[in-house]
């Protein structure tokens, strides 16, 4: 029966290695589909294996579109050879379905005329009376030629397996007629037949999609098996290779109705085959006798490997391995090409074609154990003992000599076994370390990818916000420019009208002035003519109009002036704030210190009795009442001080304290061993490294002599960083992101603790608490 497009689709997906299959799934998720089809859920694609993936594709898209979509994805991930093979197979299958009736009839007539040696019995022995058995349950074995005895399985390309399947089976699933002599000395059948025409035992069961056809010979031990034909399900469809696994009878599988011979009959056949050689047809028509095989022949292993098979010393690929003949050398995974007859290869032994490691054929005599090393001092004495004092192997005579008298001498096998156990233990340890390293590398890669994604997201966010700001400023610019242009146009129109009116008044005045000047130069008789009218007009001439700004213009100009001042102030504030915030990243020491932040709490057992604490021991302030507390050696009795917890003797520690608007405080670190009774001097010699705010905006460090500190911006939050290894204590103004002071070259001879003092009340001005603030960062070194 011909393969369906679904079978070709599954075969193509199984050809993908895991890495390419993951690329296929990822590309499939991002490939657009036709509108009439719904997309496969992403979760199902991510969990799917080849069989499940093929089922999902056919279920959601149908066979034809599933094949088209698979071809599109394969080409997208540069799997063009697989895409071309699937394309040819799909075209061939569609053309085969159109001519299925004629091909079926032709193949049926062809199957009736097959040679007897190539026909498959309908009712094999051991299964008679059960009706016709469907294909795929274990076909009858065909006889193999003698040159195939030394041949192992080799993987073939997909196109070649299709050709073999199409040539070896007709439309009804029966083997087609083929020539007994095939190229390369291959047998026409999938396996060797037992004597008397009985079929070998073969069980098949379903396996995972990662499986492959692995045939183990069901005959006597040491017998090889040829590649089986394709197997078909009862429905008529070919069973995918990933669902077939051949199980040898040595696995004690449960009884299966598809078994051709029972285990008892197989054992009897093996015993019969072990007593006499069997004649086996060869490609040239002759016969050759097989070696005796069975339990009585010690030269044959239980796994069915001939005695002349040797492993490659470098890649450990077993020549003629019945599983898959794959070279498993660390740097080589090339499937080995199986040879024909052992004697047909000449003097050069076959080997792995990639790592070029030849598989030397060794005779049974060459497999004898090598002689044990002999003692150099005492000839012919085998070194069977080991001297642990000299760390060398010795013989029995050496152990009795004066040189080794009283030494620890043990059997060399016992010492070797002990060292093997140590080696195994170290190997396990190193493998665990390597696994841990791989996990850490994977974790590091994940974190790096996560950080890169976060960086890219922040970059896009900043760009988007700045674009919004730029767009807003651009809009405001257009608004102001347009408003000012409107006001300018209005002022221009008003000025033009005013100029017109004033020009008319000036022209009238110029006319009257001219007339009066002319009258002044005339004679008396002419002067007195019309003088009254001219003088009247001169007295009643209108005064030129004064300039008056319209109220609308005044209001608009005032409004624009106010807005411009607001924009100027806002822009200045925004620029200063942004510059200040950006300068916070210019203190790399503070950023590095914050990476070593620790969780610090207040130790109430060390506190001055008047101090009041919060429930979480993160905040402290000075109270009004003297609390009656146990006066232990660790409590301060005269200084308003409380220590922090935990103490530390190594590494680097960082914590931050909110001081707010307090007018006095003390912060820093001190030795755990300091005296806590009576008055004390805060200095490094006495074990105190602190910064003190004595009065408002007056700061000093407790050095000798005290160092006055000039701080431009009073800190609202103070950061303290202690590097025990270097011997330094640094103070930072977290608010201004600036450095305050550093005690360098300190001598720490014991554990240190954080120290806090909220200061005196200062007439009610200093009642606010000191609060330990959380800091994001890594833990201590």
Swiss-Prot record:
Residue ranges annotated for the Pyrin domain, each copy included: 1-92
Stretches assigned to the B30.2/SPRY domain: 580-775
Keywords: Actin-binding, Amyloidosis, Cell projection, Coiled coil, Cytoplasm, Cytoplasmic vesicle, Cytoskeleton, Disease variant, Immunity, Inflammatory response, Innate immunity, Metal-binding, Microtubule, Nucleus, Phosphoprotein, Zinc, Zinc-finger
Region (Interaction with RELA): 266-280
Comment block on domains: The B box-type zinc finger interacts, possibly intramolecularly, with the pyrin domain; this may be an autoinhibitory mechanism released by PSTPIP1 binding.
List of residues that carry Phosphoserine: 242
Site, Cleavage: residue positions: 330-331
Residues covered by region (Required for homotrimerization and induction of pyroptosomes): 420-582
Source organism of this protein record: Homo sapiens
Protein name as it appears in the record: Pyrin
Lineage: Eukaryota, Metazoa, Chordata, Craniata, Vertebrata
Protein origin, superkingdom: Eukaryota
Entry GO MF terms: actin binding; identical protein binding; ubiquitin protein ligase activity; zinc ion binding
